[in-house]
Amino acid sequence: MHIAVVGLSHRTAPVEVREKLSIPEQTMEESLQNLRGHDQVLEASILSTCNRLEIYTLVRNPELGISAVREFLSSHSGLETGDLKPHLFAYHHEDAVGHLLRVAAGLDSLVLGEGQILSQVKKMMRLGQEHKSLGPILNRLLTQAVSTGKRVRSETNLGTGAVSISSAAVELAQLKLGQSRGLDELVTLEDEQVAVVGAGRMSRLLLQHLQAKGASGVVVLNRTVARAEALAADFPTLPVQCRPLKDLDHCLSTCSLIFTSTAADDPIIDAERLSKLNRRSSLRLIDIGVPRNIAADVEGIGGVDAHDVDDLKEVVERNQEARQQVAREAQGLLDGEARQFLEWWDSLEAVPTINRLRSSMESIRSEELMKALSRMGPDFSARERKVVEALSKGIINKILHTPVTALRSPQPRSDRQNALSVVERLFDLQADEDSVQN
């Protein structure tokens, strides 16, 4: 068996490719079932965010398993495998383990050290558990990835002052507004008429950072006004107007800065929609949705300045240099966590032999106990029988403790295989098909 990951990210694919592979939560169960339906895939878990799609699997054969995942991605996205392959990365075994730990720690994020990715890894694990696509291997790996992500943030300064996608979007707005005034600096948003489309987690973060950057008020549009009102209630000192999404055209006509972050499958703003509006001032659109909420053709509309998540790199690069040294320090911690998981993985090789050894000892114990009890006669009480049985089990456990601990302990694979061979010969342990790992 092998752990493998196949995916793409902001490092390997532009947003127009990433949005085609995005897997929303409502279709996650179906996608996981499709993956698990392949005879090569034993366990599966999917991480889908605005900047990456990664599929982690436990497979029988790494080459065949990775090929199966690529075929799934091609079918899901509608892209030919040949067109998709240049954007994909694939790792297996220790490289796959190391990659997941880097992702959970925020070292592979567009915004180095950002905290939201850890929540997304937790969600990946929760969905895998709910849809029963995880087994003991990936469940152990994801659990360790989450604990590693927490440890990196608590034991290093990586998370200190880290920006998020939402805060980078607000900074991009400040930067572009400053550049429009001939300034290479971030300027306040107090004079901007700001709107946020969507009322989810990303929109919550947008409101938080808009308030911090001086926005005097925000319009929140959402299909469900009640959800927008619930969001606004968390910002009592920020004037927030809540409107239904049908008022979007009004906001497009009156606002100067609009952020979009919805789960819509198709763009909600395009050139045709904008061309019908009677605007008298410029409009800046910043889209952090994947799939994109704003169509690429809006760039052809005069007075409209549109940006998507890939444009956030301009802001991120201004903040990254000072964090690189901290990231290098965090990598040492990740290396230790990866070794720990791989040592556990290697120890699984001993499990079938240990199980057969325990089974053999239990058969001997049970047989000899029955012989002894039969000689005790009817005067031997039930309580005394329980004491003798507990004694026999205790003796077996004491005898097995040292060899079992030795077989499970970290060691070169050749040493463990030699030890397993010796134990199997000494105790005449015959392997059966059910106990042999694929």
From Swiss-Prot:
Origin superkingdom: Bacteria
GO molecular function, one term: NADP binding
UniProt cross-references to InterPro entries, sorted A to Z: 4pyrrol_synth_GluRdtase, 4pyrrol_synth_GluRdtase_dimer, 4pyrrol_synth_GluRdtase_N, GluRdtase_CS, GluRdtase_dimer_dom_sf, GluRdtase_N_sf, NAD(P)-bd_dom_sf, Shikm_DH/Glu-tRNA_Rdtase
Positions with a binding annotation for substrate: 49-52, 109, 114-116, 120
Matching CDD domains: NAD_bind_Glutamyl_tRNA_reduct (cd05213)
Pathway: Porphyrin-containing compound metabolism; protoporphyrin-IX biosynthesis; 5-aminolevulinate from L-glutamyl-tRNA(Glu): step 1/2; Porphyrin-containing compound metabolism; chlorophyll biosynthesis
Other noteworthy facts: During catalysis, the active site Cys acts as a nucleophile attacking the alpha-carbonyl group of tRNA-bound glutamate with the formation of a thioester intermediate between enzyme and glutamate, and the concomitant release of tRNA(Glu). The thioester intermediate is finally reduced by direct hydride transfer from NADPH, to form the product GSA.
Comment on protein domains: Possesses an unusual extended V-shaped dimeric structure with each monomer consisting of three distinct domains arranged along a curved 'spinal' alpha-helix. The N-terminal catalytic domain specifically recognizes the glutamate moiety of the substrate. The second domain is the NADPH-binding domain, and the third C-terminal domain is responsible for dimerization.
The family this protein is said to belong to: Belongs to the glutamyl-tRNA reductase family.
Role noted for this protein: Catalyzes the NADPH-dependent reduction of glutamyl-tRNA(Glu) to glutamate 1-semialdehyde (GSA).
Name this polypeptide is given: Glutamyl-tRNA reductase
Record lineage: Bacteria, Bacillati, Cyanobacteriota, Cyanophyceae, Synechococcales
